[in-house]
UniProtKB/Swiss-Prot annotation:
Pfam family, one: Ribosomal_L18p
Keywords attached to this entry: Ribonucleoprotein, Ribosomal protein, RNA-binding, rRNA-binding
Organism domain of life: Bacteria
Record-level GO cellular component terms: cytosolic large ribosomal subunit
Organism: Buchnera aphidicola subsp. Baizongia pistaciae (strain Bp)
Biological role: This is one of the proteins that bind and probably mediate the attachment of the 5S RNA into the large ribosomal subunit, where it forms part of the central protuberance.
Family per record: Belongs to the universal ribosomal protein uL18 family.
Name listed for the protein in its UniProt record: Large ribosomal subunit protein uL18
Amino acid sequence: MIISINKKKARLRRAARTRFQIKKLHLIRLVVHRTSKHIYAQIIDSKNALVLTSASTVEKEILNLVKYTGNIHASICIGKKIAERALMKGIINVSFDRSGFQYHGRVKALADAARESGLKF
C-alpha cells in the first residue's frame, strides 16, 4: 500500500512540474489522464484556464467504436477524435501534458494518433 501512495505522489509531482512550465509559457496543452478502464484527453487554454475541447472513452460515440475501453485501440480512437475536434476549432499547435504518466503504451498511442491526425506538438 505504501508503494502505491509513493508512486502516485511522484506522478503528481512530475505532473505539477510539467504544468508549471507549460502555464508559464501560456501554451495550449493537450492533457491526458488514464485509469485502468478509461482514458481522457482535454485541450486546455492555460492562459484563461478554459477547456476548449475534450474526448474520452466514456462517451457513447466512442463506446460504439471499441469493444473494451482500457486498451491501446481505445487510446488511438481518442487521439484521432481529440485531433479532429481541435482542428475543427482551429487549434493546430499544442503542448503535450502526460500528467506524470510514462510516455509508453496507451499514452504514447494517443499522442501518435493525434499527431497522425494533424496536431503538432
